[in-house]
Amino acid sequence: MVTTLNRGILIQPLENLVKKSPNKIIFRSKNSKITAKDLFENSKSIALNLSQNGVTENDIFALAVIPSFEFIEIFYALLLLKVKIAIIDPEMGRENYAAKIKQLAPTWMFVDSRLLFLNDWPWIKRLFQRLHIPIPEIEIPVGPRIVKVGKAIPTKKVYFEIKNLKSNVLEKFNWSNSENPVDNVIVYTSGTLAEPKGVLHSDLSLATTISLLRAIINGEENDIVGTYLPHFMLLGVASGLTVRIMPTRMNAKQKIDWLNKNQINIMFGPPSEMLPLIIFCEDNNISFPKHMKHLMLGSAPVHQGFLNRLISVLPKSTKITCTYGMTEHLLVAIADGRVKAKYQSDGDLLGPIVQGVDIKIDDDDEILVKSEQIFSRYLHLPNREEWHRTGDLGSFDINNNLILKGRKKEMIIRRDFNIYPALYEGTIKKIPGVNEAAMVGIYDENNHDEILYLAIENSDPTVDGISNLLAKGAFSIDKQAIPDVIFKMNIPRKGRQDKIDRSAIVNYIKENKL
């Protein structure tokens, strides 16, 4: 039987790049590089080898792989096969990860070899924990077929290996051109509620977002994108730009040196990622690299105080773009960061709506959005509403800019991570001796981020070491949701439904200067 590979809308930019510039270096990392042609050929080989091993369009793949060009090869291979692809962060905590895997029920997984090594040798994992070496608190499920990715680390069990899937295959294949959108990419929202919220996107919705971002960046052939984010890697490929994969474990000096050495001139990140660089520049009386052409900010609120500090250490020629969107609809509005830093409004300037996006404000001032970018549905639901309710409150000003007024539902955005208190409070209350728990966030102007507080009501006054329990073990939670400050109090409640009074907790924190 001849395998059919899908020439979908996300595949076409890579195929066009290969025809135009087959030998262009499209990805560089510390010790390796790959051309557009080799990337495409490797992806086709992986797809064909998977097909020979029984993969069909009904299969579901979960990826637990670090961002790398190998990740992108895998991603393109799975697009070619029209399977469902789920990207799940392995550092989200044991219970959270297990709940998502249970809901997803993957038939295949691509897993980093280091995670497999620790999973196969539990005593080494326990040793790492005793030595306080940070490692993901997850267990690889039994059931899915596993492909080992990354470094050549020995494992007890025998797995498929990515290097073997890249080997040449003699099998002939046919191309198919999909006329309809293919629902194939699942992204789990960070810090979701008790029911895991897998957001299912189509290739059309993702391609539409990438096309819009490509126009916003307006890159030139020799521009170099610095990122560790998969969607910006895909954007680089679609734009024909070289992507240098940014190491994630660098201090501010190392990152500035890396930006200089690699001549990065396009960069994306949340404010929390930029803040250490700003502080380093301020302390050393230096600026960001002069060749920095475009800085894109998103994934978290971008406040004026932060922007003014950023502008003070940026070259005057560097363009700043602030993006507003969400997992369900990745790009809604954009604002020029230099304009936003000075803009006077009754709220937070989100900017003009991007092309093709429809917005309406309901009677409760909630922002509703729809366009070709919109997700297909939540994985656990059969369909979605026509308009996506963002949970944000907003309005338009006289300049037709979208202005953010606040949040409709309880959620704390810390760095680039959404924290829903109810999700974590349930886990914390399982700790013996903890009667009640309540999380609140208070924005700190100096750190340009939310300070996360956890109020504990104890039935056992000797309960202690909550931070350690939340960092590892049976009660571990997302590392981004581990509180900065933990304190004890009688949790206040209000109303007929006896809900936690979070405003009273915030007032208590401020009054007691916690």
Segments (PLM) and residue ranges:
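Conserved AMP-binding/adenylate-forming
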Residues: N49-M92, D223-I224, N418
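Conserved AMP-binding/adenylation subdomain of ANL enzymes
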Residues: L206-I224, Y228-I266
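Gly/Ser/Thr-rich phosphate-binding loop
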Residues: A152, F160, I266-F268, F280-Q344
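Conserved C-terminal "lid"/linker of ANL adenylate-forming enzymes
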Residues: I412, M439-Y443, Y453-A455, K472-L514
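AMP-binding/adenylate-forming catalytic core of the ANL superfamily
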Residues: M267, M274, S371, L393-K479
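Conserved AMP-binding A3 loop
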Residues: T35-K37, W175-N177, N184-T208, T242
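Conserved ATP/PPi-binding loop(s) of AMP-dependent carboxylate-activating enzymes
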Residues: L349-G356, K360-W387, N401, F417-I419
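Conserved pre-ATP/AMP-binding loop-to-beta segment of ANL
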Residues: R7, P22-N23, I140-P141, V147-P154, ...
